[in-house]
Structure formats: structure tokens, C-alpha cells
Amino acid sequence: MIDSNTSLVLGEGKCRYAFFPGCFLCENEPEIVVKAYDSLRFQKTDTALVILHCGDIEDVETAWDKLGQPEMILCCPRCAEFFGRELPHIPVVSLYDKLMEYGISGGCNSVDYCLHETSGGAGAGDAFAEGAGAVAELAESMGATLHPHEENSPFPYLVNDIAVRNRLKSSNHDAAHILELVYGMGASNTHLIHEHDHEHNHEHEDNCGTGSGCAGQPEPPQPLPDENRRRANLEELVQVLQMLY
């Protein structure tokens, strides 16, 4: 869990947006956090980054005020629910909507998935009610075939919640997070048809339509991090971000 030793607020002056990745993504997939923030800043340079626990209401409000009260870009349904319930005055938008708006997507992916989305509950407001459609659009824009949710699906589950991905994988179900597809990295690479730099969509304007360069063997899946590894991930993530930005 993010605490005072692993918290970070990056941004100067009045920012239009602030990316709030949340504990689960930072602990489990720190490289995706870096990639996501980089792709957001590439589109809008006045995008800040806030690595705080969403439950630290006072710290979140202080950071939000310091950055000029930006719109918060969320990728975690649990964070969205908390913001909607405890911080309803802070404007939020889902990361998946912003990725679609900016035209950011990953490379070719012809895998079949069972869509398993988390809405975040009643407190999440519109951020993830609207963002749910963007998850499907992102996957389909990469060539994935989506199937309705069902128990014990023969296809790997595609989720928008890292905690749900971990729970499914721990129960011996195949599962991947949508950001693993977009950025071509993560603990579920066994389902990625090819691996190449998905950093910015402008570098892949043809979206691999010819299939050239998209062949290859998927990498074996990485094990889910244990508690010590998750803590180390947080500490290393903060260090890397401070060096980069």
C-alpha cells in the first residue's frame, strides 16, 4: 500500500490533468505506470502525476489544490468509487476514455477474451460507467475478439482491475489487464501475440494492418509479485519517476 515513504506528486503550476494510477497498478505493474504517464504527457504536457492512496483524503485534496485542481485520470474502479463517494467535488475521468480520445492503442492482438469489467459500484459515478465501453473499444481496436462474461470461460478474462486480475490468476484462471495489452508488458504476457514498442499510437499509424513484424512467440507469464516484491516495486517506481521527471 502507498504510504508517506512511497507517495509522489509530480507537476508544476496549474495542471489540466493529473494521472492517479492507484495502489494496485503501482504495486503490481510499475512499468505500466511509467508507460501510461509517458503516453499521457506526450499528448498533454500539463499532465501531473499523483501517487497517493485514495483513502488519504487530506493528502489527495492537498495535492489536487497544489496542482490547480486538475481533472483526475483514474484507471482503478475502486479509486473511482472512493472519489465518487468521498471526494465528489473533484472531477474525474477514466484513463481508458483518455486513451481512446488520444488515439493511443497497442499493437496487433488476435486473441479471444471474455470481458470481465468492474464498474466500481454506485459511488464511482460516470467515470467507469462510461469508461467500461472504452475498455472494449481499446481491445477491439487491437484486433481482439471479445465474448460476454461467463463463469469458467474457455477464454482468458480481460479485466480493468488489477486486483481482479490477480484474484482470477490466483484461482488458476487466465486473465489479463487491458493496460497489459495496450503497453505490451505485464504479468500476463502469455496472451500477447507479439511484443514491440506500443508507447505512442503515432508510431503505429498502420496499426500493424499488414501483419508485418507481428509474428512471434508470446513470452511466458511472469509470476504475481508477493508482498515484499510489491513494496519493492513501489519504492523503485518512485525512484525511477523522480529521475525521469
Task: Report the location of each language-model feature.
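Iron-sulfur cluster-binding electron-transfer modules in prokaryotic oxidoreductases
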Residues: M1-Y245
